[in-house]
């Protein structure tokens, strides 16, 4: 009636007449502020369109897809931070790889060892997010709940499909690695347990008159001098004792070996090496150099440690420990 702020304009079905003017609240000077209702209608329609687009982007019902979309956005930043962590510890991997190459030989690819060590770190890091029920399969193979986006990437890198878990298959199938899935037969042989039993694994055979040799000299005596440590790979059933710092100090004092610092030093039983040299595998071998075997005896305190070590490694004791009832 008399107040300007109470003035109303007739509205159509859309809330205002197209092209008409609407009087808003009075300004500071008491003058009405004119508002174009058509602009209000346009703004309202834009809000509605934003609402529809928002509904479309959140219409996914598969939680794995939604989480993988978020992971894909964050992955570059995550990779950058992970790379920074590996750069922090890379000097340790590099020193270890170079040490392995010095011990084994120049044919060792140090860079490949570093890459494999980094991949193993990532595999073990998966345990940080395990559900506590399926820890063993995650140790040896891919996570059961692997994201769909990563499946295509890993299949393209491996060149073989990811084996799917099916009902009725034995647990050993789940634990098989990529080489076994690719059909490599030799992997099954490497999975056979090493038998540590019989007279050669009887701790009673070790005494103060037993003669021992360094693993490096045994390696040369059997014609494997070019590759250090090959004897342990070819004959894993042999008893070998890793000398601790106290043992290495005594061996160096007696001039049986040079001070090796942090390098490993293994002791083997001389009788075992000579039995190998007389076996069919080495009979008639021109590379045998048994004169390299510089045998020696050990003090009683070191022999006692070796007895206990052999006792713990015996296959019979492993079976007893597995069959023993749990302590309550």
From Swiss-Prot:
Cellular component aspect of the GO annotation: chromosome; histone deacetylase complex; nucleolus; nucleus
Post-translational modification Phosphoserine, affected residues: 160
Segments for region (Important for DNA and nucleosome binding): 196-315
Places the protein is found: Nucleus
Top-level lineage group: Eukaryota
Residues within the DNA-binding region(s): 158-172, 215-236
Its job: Increases DNTT terminal deoxynucleotidyltransferase activity (in vitro). Also acts as a transcriptional regulator, binding to the consensus sequence 5'-GNTGCATG-3' following an AT-tract. Associates with RAB20 promoter and positively regulates its transcription. Binds DNA and nucleosomes; may recruit HDAC1 complexes to nucleosomes or naked DNA.
GO molecular function, one term: enzyme activator activity
Swiss-Prot/TrEMBL keywords: DNA-binding, Nucleus, Phosphoprotein, Transcription, Transcription regulation
Protein's name according to its UniProt entry: Deoxynucleotidyltransferase terminal-interacting protein 1
Basic and acidic residues composition-biased segments: 142-158
Motif Nuclear localization signal per record, residues: 163-169
Biased composition (Gly residues): 12-22
Record flagged with keyword RNA-binding: no
Primary residence: nucleus
Organism: Mus musculus (Mouse)
Positions of the UniProt region annotated as Important for dimerization: 56-147
Pfam family, one: TdIF1_2nd
Region (Disordered): 1-30, 142-176
Subunit annotation: Monomer and homodimer. A minor proportion may form homotrimers. Interacts with ZNF541. Interacts with the terminal deoxynucleotidyltransferase DNTT. Interacts with TRERF1. Identified in a histone deacetylase complex that contains DNTTIP1, HDAC1 and MIDEAS; this complex assembles into a tetramer that contains four copies of each protein chain. Component of a histone deacetylase complex containing DNTTIP1, ZNF541, HDAC1 and HDAC2. Identified in a complex with KCTD19, HDAC1, HDAC2 and ZNF541.
Domain remark in the UniProt entry: The N-terminal domain mediates dimerization. The C-terminal domain mediates interaction with DNA and nucleosomes. It contains a HTH motif that mediates recognition of the consensus sequence.
